[in-house]
């Protein structure tokens, strides 16, 4: 069991004491076959390697301070890239891909393609595309990420298990001016107490970035390379996890506050996605609720190979799938209720109490009201209420094929360890002998890559 001081992910990251790597920003101009790429801007010229001085900062970024970098442009990244580019006075966007071959595939593609469920298709190739690597390019312009300066607006939409590792790899280019937003499944690893420990070990006290999270409820399915279908429009929430603690220079307080809020405010103003800006405490609660939904929908649709709506076809308490859902929710409920009543999360609960319920610290009735809020949250995460929310959410995205199902069908690693695995790990951390057998069983079945019907599923889990 991971200790509170040294969870396994933190130990793994901190065991690497090397300086953060210097990364090169490859573009299609750096591909081995220059004839395969045509310049789309006059200032890029021919891609003859002899034309460029070594390490010359040839930048594709207009207004680099405001440029947005989307790291991991999968379904969520493409959704936000597509809609952010439609804003009035839209900021320039760079898509950061994770494989070299995606650069050449981008050149021959139609760009980011987003279809809605009515069949309307939007195509957009007005993005820069880069691959960030320690390997120096042999052809074309040689550029360091951000020309060796700091990244300001970073949107990380990789798989959950890769997100923090990606941010850690980029820390050479992150600092007090940087706003990093994670848009992933699961509960962020950066909540207290682990987040502050990580940040303190990786950044000087006056140079830490701000970290935020975006909880996305939209249903999105992959339909091809750089191509997604917005199957189930919904909403999203964005808020701070860790605010950089830099002490601004004299006379820069106001500017510092504006810079802190700029990127998340910009994201929340993106048209059509209904991304609401919330406080840290609200975000924590929302992430926990979304975790429960994902812990039910993702593995079950994957094992049954079905769309989301098929999980909720029956309300019969004797139905095999209903019995699995009921037990899964009872176990998740018990873990989260215990977490809410654990003092390790006092900072998040305080934020929630003071921003949502307007409690005033130090007031005479603060303690009594705080305890009452804790009781209300315990009820909010009771099994019957979670079940009602699960059914409502699942039926709203009934036509959606879950991200875990899409990963399994494509032969990719799933996020089961960041979803149901989080519930198992938290139960162990709390040390209250909580039953999480259903979640352990789901992890085993997903990692065995089995396909079941609901009767066999119930037999294996109950």
From Swiss-Prot:
Residues spanning the membrane: none
Keyword NADP part of the UniProt annotation: yes
Region feature (Disordered): 34-55
SUPFAM superfamilies for this protein: 6-phosphogluconate dehydrogenase C-terminal domain-like
Enzyme class, broadest EC rank: oxidoreductase
UniProt biased composition (Basic and acidic residues): 38-49
Activity regulation, short description: Environmental stimuli such as light and salt stress suppress activity through stimulation of calmodulin (CaM) that binds BEA2 and probably impairs its dimerization.
GO cellular component: mitochondrion
EC number assigned by the record: 1.2.7.-
InterPro entries, per database record: 6-PGluconate_DH-like_C_sf (IPR008927), 6PGD_dom2 (IPR013328), Ketopantoate_reductase (IPR050838), KPA_reductase (IPR013752), KPR_N (IPR013332)
Residue numbers binding substrate: 294, 298, 403
Family matches, as Pfam families: ApbA, ApbA_C
Gene3D superfamilies reported in the protein's UniProt record: N-(1-d-carboxylethyl)-l-norvaline Dehydrogenase, domain 2, NAD(P)-binding Rossmann-like Domain
Disrupted gene: phenotype observed: Impairs the production of both beauvericin and bassianolide.
Catalytic activity: (R)-2-hydroxy-3-methylbutanoate + NADP(+) = 3-methyl-2-oxobutanoate + NADPH + H(+)
A single GO molecular function term of this UniProt record: NADP binding
Activity at various pH: Optimum pH is 7.5.
Thermal dependence, as annotated: Optimum temperature is 35 degrees Celsius.
Keyword entries, A-Z: Calmodulin-binding, NADP, Oxidoreductase
Membership in a protein family: Belongs to the ketopantoate reductase family.
Subunit structure of this chain's protein: Homodimer. Binds to calmodulin in a calcium-independent manner.
Function field: Ketoisovalerate reductase; part of the gene cluster that mediates the biosynthesis of beauvericin (BEA), a non-ribosomal cyclic hexadepsipeptide that shows antibiotic, antifungal, insecticidal, and cancer cell antiproliferative and antihaptotactic activity. Ketoisovalerate reductase BEA2 catalyzes the NADPH-specific reduction of ketoisovaleric acid to hydroxyisovalerate, a precursor for beauvericin biosynthesis.
Identification of the protein by name: Ketoisovalerate reductase
Species, as recorded: Beauveria bassiana
